[in-house]
């Protein structure tokens, strides 16, 4: 572990965080009375959206544009990349599902805030072409998520089938700022409904339907198809189902 990371952690006890499915490792720790997170990624992911240093750069660029974690320290060695961030306030939106809080409204507000980030000077490209290059690299390195399920998509039976299908069905993109993984575990809500966003490694310019697709899937799988449809019906634009499906398929191996 690099000296700068060791010095900041000092004698704090690292607690593993098991939430999430990425190849990154996350630990929380207390320093004084404040909560921090140490996130690391293997060096082989340095050129991908799993890169911790990429995420740190996204967070630093977003500071003042969106409520995101403060980056405290970054470092790297031959094996891993490292980032320490300060914890954001609030609780995950996932904890509010099933309560009396306005979950759909909070999802819509989260989407509005993210897509309102100006992209004219955004240096991060997360468009479909970039993500497909990333998927091809991960597939070639044997780094894809092996727990995939193609049952919903007839004619696709292997990861190679899916990659070919994705290349053949790239949608026309309406580029906005995208979180890249906008689900209920990555949106934090305070008592007065102030929103904070975490896990922005995939952040950057991308099609507006990417984040919509993730929210729709989140609601469909965790609540009901009806509630997911209600979310779509309240959008200010007509649904583009083909775009949503493309981004769900793109995420299946990641």
Give the predicted meaning of each segment.
Residues 48, 174-178, 190-242:
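Active-site Asp-x-Gly
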Residues 8-31:
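ATP-binding glycine-rich phosphate-binding loop
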Residues 86:
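Conserved Hanks-type protein kinase catalytic core
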Residues 23-31, 37-38, 161-210:
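Active-site acidic catalytic loop and adjacent metal/ATP-binding pocket
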Residues 17-18, 237-254:
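Charged phosphate-binding loop/patch that engages nucleotide di/tri-phosphates or the phosphate backbone
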Residues 63, 111, 115-119, 220, ...:
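Protein kinase-like catalytic domain
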Residues 23, 36-83, 94-114:
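A conserved alpha-helical element in kinase catalytic cores
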Residues 2-7, 113-179:
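An alpha-helical support segment within catalytic cores of ATP-dependent transferases
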């Amino acid at each position: 572990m690099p000296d700068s990371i060791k010095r900041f952690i000092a004698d704090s006890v690292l607690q593993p965080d098991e939430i999430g499915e990425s190849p990154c490792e996350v630990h929380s720790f207390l320093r004084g009375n404040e909560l921090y997170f140490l996130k690391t990624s293997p060096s082989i992911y340095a050129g991908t959206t799993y890169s911790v240093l990429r995420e740190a750069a996204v967070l630093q660029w977003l500071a003042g544009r969106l409520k995101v974690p403060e980056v405290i320290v970054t470092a790297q060695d031959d094996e891993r990349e490292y980032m320490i961030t300060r914890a954001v306030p609030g609780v995950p939106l996932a904890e509010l599902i099933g309560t009396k809080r306005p979950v759909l409204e909070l999802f819509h507000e989260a989407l509005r805030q993210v897509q309102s980030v100006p992209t004219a000077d955004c240096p991060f490209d997360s468009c479909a072409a970039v993500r497909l290059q990333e998927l091809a690299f991960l597939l070639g390195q044997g780094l894809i998520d092996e727990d995939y399920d193609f049952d919903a998509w007839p004619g696709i039976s292997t990861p190679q089938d899916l990659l070919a299908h994705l290349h053949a069905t790239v949608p026309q993109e309406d580029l906005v700022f995208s979180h890249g993984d906008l689900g209920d575990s990555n949106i934090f809500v305070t008592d007065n409904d102030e929103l904070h966003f975490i896990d922005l490694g995939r952040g950057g310019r991308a099609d507006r339907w990417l984040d919509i697709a993730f929210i729709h899937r989140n609601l469909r799988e965790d609540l009901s198809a009806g509630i997911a449809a209600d979310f779509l019906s309240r959008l200010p634009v007509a649904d583009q189902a083909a775009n949503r499906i493309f981004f769900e398929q793109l995420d299946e191996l990641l």
